[in-house]
Amino acid sequence: GDVYKRQGLKEVFRDVSAITDYNGTLELTFVGYHFDEEAKYSVAECKARDVTYAVPLRVTARLNNTETGEIKESEVFMGDFPKMTDSGTFVINGAERVIVSQLVRSPGIYYGIAHDKLGKKLYSSTVIPNRGAWLEYETDSNDVFYVRVDRTRKVPITVLIRALGIGTNAEIVDLFGEEPKILASFTKDTAESYQEGLLELYKKIRPGEPLAVDSAESLINSMFFDPRRYDLAKVGRYKFNKKLMLKNRIAGCILAEDAVSQLTGEIVAEKGTKITRELADKIQNNAVPYLWVEGEDEERNIKIL
């Protein structure tokens, strides 16, 4: 609870700041916050009165008029923040409650294996972000690799790869090698370039809307590359790294750039460091989103996710 109050709320306010009006004239930012020291009622009184055991949350807000340069700052009451009791419970409307984590919906990556009628294994995985579109991957009996973006109709994985900027078959093979599932996906993919891939994916995500490359680019960029719209969060990144066994893939490599913890913002290992087993474990546990390591060709570094 204390960690969330110190760090989590700060990140929430940082994510929503700054709020601007339609014309961009007024800009509202949250510059600080604090809690009252004591709750209005004790735990016993909250149960007797059927109220929530909570402390007032007060936020310092700053309003900036970008046209006149005028800045106003004041403290506002944001609401009552439920407070955990000494026994780890919460009192909500007089009833004592506990929080149960919902693992199925927790951010991260999930795998599944099914079988077709002939007993062939069909693989699937789902990437669930803290906020943003789900990505659901699956293979079929013909080894075609499909993806669903935000619960829409499935498309060959190569359509998504093209829409992310790797447009031609040659570029895709250069990146992934002659992976059989990628080659099989080409047979179901009518697109042959970045723009065609963009429009094909756009048709599935926004069926019925006029096709335009600009609109498709804007949609893909906002869906996957805007931190306010797509975020795995620290928990999701930690679980993603663990499931993909990041530590096994980076052990023995030499860092081409500093490894920075997403949990604390601190440098876990400096550029030029050879990654030992112990250091690889530390990097994985710190939810580092990616690493740049030195490649066999000295002029080319490799990004490991």
Regions found by a protein language model. Name each.
Residues 1-305:
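N-terminal non-catalytic structural scaffold regions of very large proteins
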